[in-house]
């Protein structure tokens, strides 16, 4: 069964072009030009990945992203017409997993789609039974079910946040560099990410875990090196 991709962009030429390239890769595509149509699709259809334009008339792509994150954990890629840190950081902060700036190469977008889907599937249930649960100081990560609990309360994490936390816990006691996190999460399809990308995801993780940068209980910053979770 082919993966189902949602594409929302009011620029018909871009949406149609992305649809063409996705279908050439045998994906099932739900294409919409308005937020209203997209929100109806989200409520009634099974989606594996969403591609959302930030600048939509009426309801923005950021609002759609937030509504998706209220119920779903599948990857979200944001399309932005502005190459600014504010747009990118805002998207990542509210739950997006990746972004790409217009104009973009269709093949680059397809590569990112494949990378996000591969990572999401990998971390959603491929470990052996005796390796699928990570437990540490009140934190429980189930790799198979893609669920995370802190002090018996479930955390709502994006796929990228889940991956970062899993990697840090699997390497607890050791410093994990931003470069290694980049490689583990985005793989060979990593292109030109901002240096702030991992920082934003870490900050969002800390907020959800009620952790602080000054006196962290879980995620510690080792300045100039990376991040670690103490044993």
From Swiss-Prot:
It is found in: Cytoplasm. Keywords: Activator, Antibiotic resistance, Cell wall biogenesis/degradation, Cytoplasm, DNA-binding, Phosphoprotein, Plasmid, Repressor, Transcription, Transcription regulation, Two-component regulatory system. Residues 131-231 bind DNA. Pfam families: Response_reg, Trans_reg_C. One of its GO terms (cellular component) is cytosol. GO terms for biological process: cell wall organization; negative regulation of DNA-binding transcription factor activity; response to antibiotic. Residues 4-117 form the Response regulatory domain. One of its GO terms (molecular function) is transcription cis-regulatory region binding. SMART domains: REC, Trans_reg_C. The modification 4-aspartylphosphate is found at residue 53. Phosphorylated by VanS. Dephosphorylated by VanS. Can be phosphorylated nonenzymatically by acetyl-phosphate. Member of the two-component regulatory system VanS/VanR. Binds to the promoter regions of target genes, including vanH and vanR; phosphorylation of VanR increases binding affinity to the vanH and vanR promoters significantly. DNA binding may be inhibited by the cognate sensor protein, VanS. Activates the transcription of vanH, vanA and vanX in response to vancomycin which results in vancomycin resistance. Involved in conferring vancomycin resistance. This is Regulatory protein VanR. The gene is vanR.
């Amino acid at each position: 069964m082919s993966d189902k991709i949602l594409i929302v962009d009011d620029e018909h030429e871009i949406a149609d072009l992305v649809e063409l390239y996705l279908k050439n890769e045998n994906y099932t595509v739900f294409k919409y030009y308005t937020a209203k149509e997209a929100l109806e699709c989200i409520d009634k259809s099974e989606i594996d990945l969403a591609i959302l334009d930030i600048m939509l008339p009426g309801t923005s792509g950021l609002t759609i992203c937030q509504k998706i994150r209220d119920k779903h954990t599948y990857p979200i890629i944001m399309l932005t017409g502005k190459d600014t840190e504010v747009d990118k950081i805002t998207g990542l902060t509210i739950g997006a997993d990746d972004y790409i700036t217009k104009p973009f190469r269709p093949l680059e977008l397809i590569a990112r789609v494949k990378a996000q889907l591969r990572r999401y599937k990998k971390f959603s249930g491929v470990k052996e039974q005796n390796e699928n649960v990570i437990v540490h100081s009140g934190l429980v990560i189930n790799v198979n079910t893609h669920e995370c609990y802190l002090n018996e309360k479930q955390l709502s994490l994006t796929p990228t946040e889940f991956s970062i936390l899993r990697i840090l816990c699997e390497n607890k006691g050791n410093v994990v560099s931003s470069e290694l996190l980049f490689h583990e999460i985005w793989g060979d399809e990593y292109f030109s990410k901002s240096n702030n990308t991992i920082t934003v995801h870490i900050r969002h993780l800390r907020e959800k875990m009620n952790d602080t940068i000054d006196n962290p209980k879980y995620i510690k910053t080792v300045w100039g090196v990376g991040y670690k979770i103490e044993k």
